[in-house]
Amino acid sequence: MVYHWHYPTPEGFSDMEMTGDGEFLTGLWFTGARGAGKHSGPWTEAFLPVFAETSQWLDLYFRGQQPGFVPKFQIQNLTPFRQEVLEILQAIPHGETMTYGQIARQIEKKQGLPQMSAQAVGGAVGWNPVCILIPCHRVLGANGSLTGYGGGIENKIALLKLEGHDVSKFKLPK
């Protein structure tokens, strides 16, 4: 059974939706996000302990604090490539960013590959089912462009501002 809960965010952000299996968080996304269909129901509305834990984490995060814990989440349909990309995303510190190309270079080096596609990395980043917890919003295009965020460019900008970035240094999509 899949459970669902709606999380009202502070002003300046779209609200969020979360799903869980009864023990683990399995999805966290902005309401109306591109690709939200991958989280489609049917759901049972319930406020589970993992939703309470995730809500507490989000409350702290949206107040500009760095929570000292991570809610229990479980990612389904995880390929080895996606896992590698998501592990790199989890290692991007609060207040820092990386480009898709930098992530690709890390994978090249680790696997001893002659080349890794930044576009393939982008596909894996876009697949992330638990946004913010796995901080895909910290990934930029090669020229510092704010591209490829399924939660909406406005939310990406707001998240980066919340983390202390001067977003005027980034390039906005046209």
Regions found by a protein language model. Give the residues of each.
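Beta-strand secondary-structure signal
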Residues: 4-6, 17, 27
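Nucleic acid-binding interface residues in structured DNA/RNA-binding domains
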Residues: 2-13, 65-174
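Compact structured core domains
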Residues: 22-70
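Broad, structure-driven detector of short, well-ordered beta-strand segments within folded domains
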Residues: 15-22
